Amino acid sequence: MLVAVALLELHIPHAQSLKDKRAVVRSVRDRLRNLDLSAKEVALQDLHQRARMAVAFVALDNAAADSVLEKVRELVESVPDAMLTGWTSEKLDFDETAPLT
């Protein structure tokens, strides 16, 4: 079992206010949640043209995690009002058969 987390940074060039930015971030977050992923803005909340978001999910194996991460990247890159300017991801492997303490 893997827990995967992606950290992404967006540039929102047409945002003239935090309200404009929030609308774009909300749109991205809702699209990601439609894929049953957890998504949250985690930094840069006071900058109206930049956003940093985290996306997290659980996958059964490495191939499934890579597939979902690719879908996340494609989805974010398809948002017309935002440009993906930064991306990093990590996968944490857990042994689901290990005894729980």
Q: Model segments located where?
A:
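Flexible hinge/switch segments at interdomain interfaces of large molecular machines
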Residues: 1-2, 46
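Short glycine-/aliphatic-rich beta-strand segments at the starts of folded cytosolic domains
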Residues: 3-14, 18
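Hydrophobic residues positioned within well-ordered beta-strands of beta-sheet architectures
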Residues: 4-8, 51-53, 85
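Ordered, soluble secondary-structure elements with a strong preference for glycine-centered loop motifs
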Residues: 15-23, 62-66
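Short amphipathic alpha-helix segments
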Residues: 19-38
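Short beta-strand elements
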Residues: 35-43, 83-90
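Short, charge-patterned binding micro-sites
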Residues: 39-61
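C-terminal structural segments of small proteins and small subunits
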Residues: 59-101
